[in-house]
Amino acid sequence: MAQIITRGIKALVDEANAQIETMTPQQVMSAAAKGDVVIVDIRDPREIERDGRIPGAFACTRGMLEFWIDPNSPYAKPAFQQDKKYIFHCAGGMRSALAAKTADDMGLKPVAHMGGGFAAWKEAGGDIEAFAPKTTKA
């Protein structure tokens, strides 16, 4: 018997968008210029490598989000312990809405997400830096 999904992705994203702030790329650029935000890139590392990233953005995949936010987790990241606004983005705006809602539900505040994601950032003329893989010394 096939699974019956009772709440699909559209309902989940709509719920997230109703709960959290959605910012335009221009608003994110303005906030980033002031330096009082952390831009969180939740795209897969392969997407970042292929498409580049917003300069200064902190990369955190969706799979590690809760573990990196929780200060009591052995995987907690200092980037999530700052008294700043957290603006999440993905490629198109759906995953970042879900990530921002999760962060908000965990108590990380204030949070927002960038509507339209990285595609909207590029279209708005936002700065993009090429992916620079970490190198190891022999």
Which role does the model predict for each range below?
Residues 1-37, 45-86, 94-138:
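Rhodanese-like catalytic fold shared by cysteine-dependent sulfurtransferases
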Residues 89:
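Short, surface-exposed ligand- or partner-binding patches at beta-edge/loop junctions that are enriched
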